[in-house]
Amino acid sequence: MRDYDEVIAFLGEWGPFQRLIFFLLSASIIPNGFNGMSVVFLAGTPEHRCLVPDTVNLSSSWRNHSIPLETKDGRQVPQSCRRYRLATIANFSAMGLEPGQDVDLEQLEQESCLDGWEYDKDIFLSTIVTEWNLVCEDDWKTPLTTSLFFVGVLCGSFVSGQLSDRFGRKKVLFATMAVQTGFSFVQIFSTNWEMFTVLFAIVGMGQISNYVVAFILGTEILSKSVRIIFSTLGVCTFFAIGYMVLPLFAYFIRDWRMLLLALTLPGLFCVPLWWFIPESPRWLISQRRFAEAEQIIQKAAKMNSIVAPAGIFDPLELQELNSLKQQKVIILDLFRTRNIATITVMAVMLWMLTSVGYFALSLNVPNLHGDVYLNCFLSGLIEVPAYFTAWLLLRTLPRRYIIAGVLFWGGGVLLLIQVVPEDYNFVSIGLVMLGKFGITSAFSMLYVFTAELYPTLVRNMAVGITSMASRVGSIIAPYFVYLGAYNRLLPYILMGSLTVLIGIITLFFPESFGVTLPENLEQMQKVRGFRCGKKSTVSVDREESPKVLITAF
């Protein structure tokens, strides 16, 4: 009995058909790159201070001293959320008293920003923060906005696979791209923070669903060798391209509504792809729609200038292949023994903390010294060599050592930021980018590593559970950034410490490189970290390794 890959082997590996599918599906990921990180600019918080209305009769000296000072990063700056009581200083101004000379400012009564705020417009002309005053008592709404987006991502990751299994890869791919583009457009007309946030969560659902289904469609259509490149470098690199495009849009469009409109329009260019991207023949076969599947393969053969054999698919053979039953498993199987439970708990921690590091570094760009647009571009650019490095390392070296190594690298350089003098801002930025490089490399290896640890029976469930843990990490990450408002170095100290910690834990995983993949839970129980013994090694065709999604989204 032949499998699907053997049936379509006559198409070749890298013909015009495969190249077209590779680049079109990868290109469909570009909007995910800039929509996923758009909150950096849509919800940017500029410098702000209490508004002192022009109608208040104050002398120029009292107007200049109407805001108390505080020490921030070693320098005196106006407070963002307090001002001196206007009635009091207006009375002093009318009496001709001078601040600091006739009146001790430290003894003056203070009040909150009763008349609103004035915002610095050097970086952002407007954001959702400036429009709805998400500062001071309401500053908690900003990280919550980002967290709820990732809650949408978490929900979308639940339903995307089930929808594509039921309705088909192609239909769900374009439906979810429409959801992402359509609701992003509706966000432009948000009248309050609540409306914006609900719509943003729906955009998150559409984004991850589009991403996952595009990945599934590519891995099912492309041949074995191309499948590896597509799943490791294709979607990752094009995601990074979208990430790098974001600051270019934001630099020239400083108003959040116009920026959102500009980020929405590229989604319309995906509409013509409907006529070029076919349905997955594998899915059609699973639905017993053999004639449609054969028609797609015939067109692919024609595009590749290959004469297809008559009767490509044998319905009886494929029906026999699809009727193979698998033993039912439940989530408790991931905790059946102490060894399996330990591996599962460590894997959940590894995914969650690595996700926290990746997203916290990505979202913390506005808090870096220097130009926020350049820093965001560099943050996206550094992902490209990180993905290539991860791909090369996975091909040649033991998994747990390379993952632990890049985590030590990423966490270590983040911890070094606290010893860099404030005058050397470029050094701090360089260390942040090196930390992002290490954590991104680690993140991109986790899917492959996790899939190789578990037997076939529970592999998808294990990857799903640990991937869910990474979504939880992304929901938590905005609050690491939020801590930067209290101390600029605190997020880096926490991220660096947790990344080094999880790097140490990674060393206790069993090694999967060059080892026969377990086929059942009993075989997995024999795997032990650091246990010296005879291991069954095989000449593993890397193209037969589990194919899994290896980017943050």
Swiss-Prot record:
The keyword Nucleotide-binding applies. It is a multi-pass membrane protein. Disruption phenotype: Knockout mice developed normally and did not display any gross phenotypic abnormalities. Knockout mice show a complete deficiency of ergothioneine in heart, liver, small intestine, kidney and erythrocytes. Impaired intestinal absorption and renal reabsorption of ergothioneine. Lower tolerance to intestinal oxidative stress. Allosterically activated by intracellular ATP. The keyword Transmembrane applies. Residues 1-20, 164-171, 219-232, 279-339, 395-400, 450-462, 510-553 are cytoplasmic. ATP binds at residues 218-225. InterPro entries: MFS_dom, MFS_sugar_transport-like, MFS_trans_sf, Orgcat_transp/SVOP, Sugar_transporter_CS. Mediates the Na(+)-independent and pH-dependent bidirectional transport of exogenous prototype organic cation tetraethylammonium (TEA). NCBIfam families: 2A0119. This is Solute carrier family 22 member 4.
